[in-house]
């Protein structure tokens, strides 16, 4: 089953995390778009996406973490500057806010190319996974990462796999 996240009819529904539990480990997934989207207008009473900015999302995560201290938290964020190979100043500031709020893993996307992975406090920040299925003419747009996140009681493991986009299809890199 695919569980929608970062979606709803009200701001409250949109910012609410998806909660999962497996083998006694609880995980909350938050999803937000930090950028203004082309051709997208949020309309009252209509379904929409979470557009909480970094400070708003960090406040929500902090509040959630206080109520659920043993729950692991993943924030999936649409942020950054297209085709920039390193995180923008704003991404770095937002990552610090989210890490300080108690986020365990941040998974970023939007730049269309891979950006670095960094550890901030106890949070693994994947600034951009790159493209996964996307028709790009640029060489750097045909590379991506796939993240495998494993939570244990006192440990978070993040493994990144290199992905090549071949004819718009992702393939695990053989290199």
Question: What is the predicted function of each stretch?
Answer:
Residues 1-175:
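Acidic, metal/ion-coordinating pockets
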